[in-house]
Amino acid sequence: MGQDWDIIITNKSKLLSLDLHEVWRYRDLLAMYVKRDIITFYKQTILGPLWFIIQPVFTTIMFMFVFGGIAGISTDGIPQAVFYLAGLVCWNYFQDCLSKCSDTFNANQAIFGKVYFPRLVVPLSIVISNLIKMGIQFALFLVVYSYYFATGINFQINAALLLVPILIVMLGGLGLGFGMIISSMTTKYRDLRFLITFGVQLWMYATPVIYPLSVMKETYPKYIWVLVANPLTAILETFKYAFTGVGEFNWLYLGYSFSFTIIILLLGIVIFNRVQRNFMDVI
């Protein structure tokens, strides 16, 4: 008696293959991973999901005290709470996507070796679960933003607000792309796992999170190319400009960041697909 098979496992001959049809077929598994990531974050904690808000609030206060108060770094006339929180919302999303995606193979080697499913489900679930976390922090930003707006701060809201969803997708794409590349490399070079946290921290200081790009142009004009080459610079500057009307909004810089995101994402997919074929033999 013949049998009908719903799922056929075939050899992945194409390196540049998203296998989105397979990901969609396993959408229930994707949803389960997203739920697991969120629950795991605050499981057995007293405050639970409130940590999504507490972390950016206390970090913003620290930035206001250290960089705004002691160091006296300008925020281009933007209220410090709005300026720092805007940068943190974007940076935290990118950082979380990068850090967690970079541990995909090592953290899931047990299940990868036993059960078949499209491996892309795991890093995608990380990006989606962190998007939910970012949504909560973005709501916090809007509350703080609305407070200052109600007190008479003249924010110059503009059409760049329409780009905010694209900016968020770019942040997730960069985190996913870099994360897949690093995760693939750590299957052979375990030392990279210890460098990720340190490297990401340094990267934040090369990104206009605690300072505006205009200040760096005035203070260190010879080294501004380092910040411009950072694909996150245009994203954060455009995000701040969209809500305040202050910042460096440049279509050329933004186009560079968009192109960089596409390239890193495609490169990450190629390397990820290449490594997933035989990573169990390596690990």
Regions found by a protein language model. Give the residues of each.
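Hydrophobic transmembrane alpha-helices and immediately adjacent juxtamembrane helices
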Residues: 1-283
